[in-house]
Amino acid sequence: LDTVKANALKFYPDLQKSLDEKDKNVEELRIKVIAYRDFYADGDAAIETTEFIDIKNNAEKFNSFIHSLSPDGGGDEPENGLEALALSMKSDWVKDGDRQRHIIVVWSDASTHPLEKAATSSQENYPAEMPKDFNELTDWWDGQSYMSNRSAKRLIMFAPDCNAWTDIATHWDNTVHYPSRAGEGLAEVDYQTILSAIVNSI
């Protein structure tokens, strides 16, 4: 987590530099962070999130949230990455303007709980109105409920080559997958690869 946090804190200036180098101008840049663990092991501490933050004008708010994150909890694998992905799809994306990019970046070194598990578990903290299974989550990405602007959406994943992550990489459009090693953290992720993937998607 320390490596991810350090990279997150320098993310905006590095991204802006990369955009400038490619003569790309982004008038409005909003970032939302969803930090997740395991609803079935961590209860109310399973998820921490921000609203969308105007990173150009309110970087301090973003940095404060990143500093507050800790690696506590999570239990053993798997974790609730699919729920975090669903929550990101349900976000308040900007819909005005001719040129938009709705980019979701997933950093994970864990496999995922199946969405069906929620139907047989009584977790009061589990988020409302989640997809009941992977097929419904796929429908969300396809624009049947969310992410309806096909030309705007992008999904960049740094996640293990296993279960749902592999299925997403294989079957979802506008998706790039850089495999990480399950259970070994994300220190091996090339930070410049992350920046390049985002800049090239704009």
Model-derived features: where do they sit?
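Extracytoplasmic/secreted cell-surface and envelope-processing proteins
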Residues: 1, 41-45, 97, 112-121, ...
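Von Willebrand factor
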Residues: 1-107, 112
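VWA/integrin I-like adhesion module and closely mimicked acidic/polar interface patches used
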Residues: 110-172
